Amino acid sequence: MRSPRSDSGSLVSSSATSDNAATQIVLAFDDNRLASLLFGQYGQNLALIERRLGVVAEQRGNHVTLAGSRDGVERSRRVLEGLYEQLRRGDELVSGDVEGAIRLAIAQGSLFDYDPATARPSFEEINLRKRAVRARTAAQDAYIRALRRHALVFGTGPAGTGKTWLAVAHAVQLFERKEVDRIILSRPAVEAGERLGFLPGDMREKVDPYLRPIYDALYDLMDPRIVERALQTGEIEIAPLAFMRGRTLSNAVIILDEAQNTTTMQMKMFLTRLGENSRMIVTGDPSQVDLPPGQTSGLAEATRLLRNVEGIGHIVYTAEDVVRHELVARIVDAYDKAALKPARGRDIKE
């Protein structure tokens, strides 16, 4: 039996009974409104915890009873306490935060022994003026650490794993800290055949449709007025891949998105633009190459050639790291399995 009060004051009481592997505890939260947000509409957050951690969670008012294996109950308790503290700080709670907290609790139990006195309290976090961005998976955690450690980082994997999002967040953090002068955004415009001169409008209008995911991240992570001003002054620069030849990019964070659609020569040209006090982040999904048949992906070749080069980070995401709606991970996994079946007897280029 235990009835502590947490340091935050969020956990009012809890009780526990244990019979071998079976455990039951009761948690009570002192703010009814926050408890309601914690449990989710119609208890959807509790339902997700039940599904992912193999426990039974029964809610009564601001109390929740957790029953199941000792490990499952302990992980569920850490998830609920962590999310409640997030709400007490005034932060918004979305379904992705719940999934991230669950993955953290699982990682604490499987990647290293959990000891409340010594365990890492959470995955890595990027603190920005507008908001904090926290890794939700072990791969994202490793990605953030790689971004801080290396001048060049490759992040590859399926859509929805946060590769581009975290790259932009890291770039914004360095920009806000004045560690770099500029953020440079680029991607190959395969759909336009890189012949951007034939498209109407100025350079930003030509490239905007191809960089929309990066723009969305910028506006979500920074004050829109600051983004617009930085675009006007060139502190945030849109640089089509085809227009980067001959430049040396210094004191900047350069992000190349959708890099799976670069050719070998384009990738080599891009990587050799790295200048003094600059960081490069290359993201892409090797399974979504839109190059003409027979054309080797510059991303696939670069990650192969540079895998053991000192000073370069490589993070590979899988379907398990998808942080969009939980169905997205299943969809990606289904497509990946289907793609493997007809591969036999066929010449598949990397």
Describe each PLM feature range.
Residues 1-19, 341-350:
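Acidic, low-complexity intrinsically disordered tails
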Residues 17-36:
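Short glycine-/aliphatic-rich beta-strand segments at the starts of folded cytosolic domains
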Residues 34-51:
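Short amphipathic alpha-helix segments
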Residues 58-120:
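Interdomain "pre-motor" coupling segment immediately N-terminal to P-loop NTPase/helicase cores
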Residues 63, 128-138, 146-256, 260-350:
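Conserved helicase motor core of SF1/SF2 NTP-dependent helicases
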